[in-house]
């Protein structure tokens, strides 16, 4: 399935071993991992963080959900699947596939509203999927920067995305430190201002200027500079420790490579997207770039977009401070390497604490193939 700007291999839980160790061993072999050559030639993966992903669908007995799913980020060069976070892009593909497989009921015509349970994070998500003649509509005119072809729009609502976390991590607060802005000492950078946020996925936000960057960089500007990538990883790893996700920076870099993400932001500027299309500062509220598993993402992760929408609405956050004046945070557009993306968040204060009611965005998804996959285990 393609979901948003990512691709992954989807399974139904009853088709997989129930033992987690056996399940993960099979999934890694299907994807072609671990591969010391970094290519996943002998599997279904495509050797990037955006394409080395698996999703497992399962029926649910929860009264507030129609389908449950788990997301796994499959390491390319090491024998590991990280089940600690979510992929907001592949979330888009869960509902249409569940409908097509008969796992959930949907109207023959109109909009199917599918309530999803994200089992990694313990969060509810609602997808709105267009139906026609009893089938999911995939063709359409919705354009998503980072995806070449237009498709049908799928609107997503992430309900109360702030806080939460893996079962073995406990319930992590939306602002783990209790502050909108934190000061951390990073070797090679000195004292830097960060916003540490748990919404969508745990994310560390930093101003591009603090890194000596403009915020308009493309993949070739970042991923070809190992010394810069090491500096970015140092910021992310220190943020992971401050958020309580890792016990040390070494632990963060070795065992927590997927979350937290690192996102750097800058005021709106003109730039050229990766497809050569100009993006004008007048069309966006700010610029954002996100690091995914050690590399600059080609567009924007779905969960990164959620975190950005929430951070933008938090007064005084790193993201909020680069917004254009009078930006409406319930619907804003930001720039990323492949173009632009519209997101929005609805926040409120209760007893002096910020809470997120929902974050919304639109993506698209398409079934690329369905059938048997073979693996030698």
Predicted feature residues:
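A glycine-rich beta-to-alpha transition motif near the start of alpha/beta enzyme domains, typified by
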Residues: 1-377
């Amino acid at each position: 399935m393609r979901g948003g700007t990512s691709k992954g291999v989807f399974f139904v839980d009853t088709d997989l071993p129930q033992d987690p160790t056996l399940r993960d061993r099979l999934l890694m072999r299907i994807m072609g991992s671990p591969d010391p050559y970094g290519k996943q030639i002998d599997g279904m993966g495509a050797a990037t963080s955006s394409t080395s992903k698996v999703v497992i669908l399962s029926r649910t007995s929860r009264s507030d959900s129609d389908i449950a799913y788990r997301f796994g980020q499959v390491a390319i060069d090491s024998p590991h699947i990280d089940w600690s976070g979510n992929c907001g892009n592949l979330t888009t593909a869960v509902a249409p596939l569940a409908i097509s497989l008969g796992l959930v009921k949907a109207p023959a015509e109109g909009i199917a509203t599918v309530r999803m349970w994200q089992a990694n994070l313990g969060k509810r998500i609602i997808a709105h999927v267009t139906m026609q003649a009893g089938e999911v509509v995939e063709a359409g005119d919705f354009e998503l920067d980072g995806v070449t072809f237009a498709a049908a729009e799928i609107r997503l609502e992430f309900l109360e995305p702030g806080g939460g976390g893996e079962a073995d991590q406990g319930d992590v607060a939306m602002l783990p430190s209790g502050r909108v802005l934190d000061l951390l000492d990073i070797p090679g950078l000195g004292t830097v201002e960060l916003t540490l946020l748990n919404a969508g996925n745990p994310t560390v936000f930093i101003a591009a200027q603090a890194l000596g960057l403009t915020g308009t960089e493309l993949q070739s500007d970042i991923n070809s500079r190992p010394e810069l990538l090491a500096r970015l990883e140092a910021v992310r790893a220190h943020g992971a420790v401050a958020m309580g996700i890792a016990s040390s920076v070494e632990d963060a870099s070795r065992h927590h490579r997927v979350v937290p993400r690192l996102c750097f932001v800058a005021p709106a500027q003109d730039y050229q997207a990766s497809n050569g299309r100009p993006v004008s500062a007048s069309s966006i509220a700010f610029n954002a770039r996100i690091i995914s598993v050690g590399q600059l993402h080609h567009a924007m992760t779905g969960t990164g977009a959620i975190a950005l929408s929430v951070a933008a609405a938090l007064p005084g956050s790193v993201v909020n401070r680069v917004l254009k004046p009078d930006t409406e945070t319930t619907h804003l557009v930001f720039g990323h390497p492949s173009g632009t993306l519209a997101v929005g968040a609805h926040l409120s204060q209760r007893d002096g604490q910020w809470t997120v009611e929902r974050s919304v965005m639109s993506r698209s998804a398409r079934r690329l193939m369905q059938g048997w996959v073979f693996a030698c285990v």
